[in-house]
Design a protein with these regions (language model features):
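Structural detector for helix-capping/boundary residues
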Residues: 5, 11, 56, 74, ...
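Residues at the C-termini of beta-strands that transition into short coil/loop
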Residues: 31-34, 55-56, 62, 129, ...
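Conserved AMP-binding/adenylation subdomain of ANL enzymes
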Residues: 100-124, 132-166
Length: 166
């Protein structure tokens, strides 16, 4: 249905896809994400050729210059699926325009809070709302736009979160 071309896969989820038949899918590239030194070697069996690289290494090797292509602002940017609480799962699409307008509105609203209660460059953002929950209310896009440092803690584990906060 969504026909994704790129899969960003954290090593934590590798067991969920180890038997997936990538040759029958639209996925052309797999980008490996790992914070624990886990190698992607052997994880994808005969689909190892689809692994484009490790996320941090790809970022490090990338040029700081990029000429973004023009495309219609109503092009789909993200797709979310419901869990099917009222029937079959349903896909929800967000366009680039929707994400930009939401981010601008959110940044303007937060910038207008009294007593400097909003966010500003130099702040650190760590989402507690799951990413699948309406883009964590869209704030990761706003945080990127404003230039906040972002910390993504992974699975909800109270002790680990406290270690990150303290």
């Amino acid at each position: 249905h969504a026909k994704p071309k790129v899969l960003l896969l954290n090593s934590e989820f590798a067991p969920l896809v180890k038997d997936y038949q990538f040759e029958n899918s639209s996925i052309e590239h797999i980008i490996w994400l790992d914070d624990n030194g886990v190698s992607h070697e052997g994880v994808f069996g005969g689909n190892q050729n689809r692994v484009t690289g490790e996320y941090e290494a790809l970022l490090e090797a990338a040029s700081s210059e990029f000429d973004f292509p023009d495309f219609d602002e109503n092009t789909i940017a993200t797709t979310f699926y419901t869990s099917g609480t009222t029937g079959d799962p349903k896909g929800v699409f967000f366009s680039h325009r929707q994400l930009v307008l939401h981010s601008l509105t959110e940044a303007a609203t937060l910038g207008m809070l009294p007593n400097k209660q909003g966010v500003s460059y130099g702040d650190v953002y760590m989402p507690m709302t799951p990413m699948f929950h309406v883009h964590a209310w869209g704030f990761p896009f706003t945080a990127t736009m404003v230039g906040l440092k972002q910390v993504y803690p992974g699975r909800y584990a109270p002790d680990a979160l406290m270690d990150l906060i303290i």
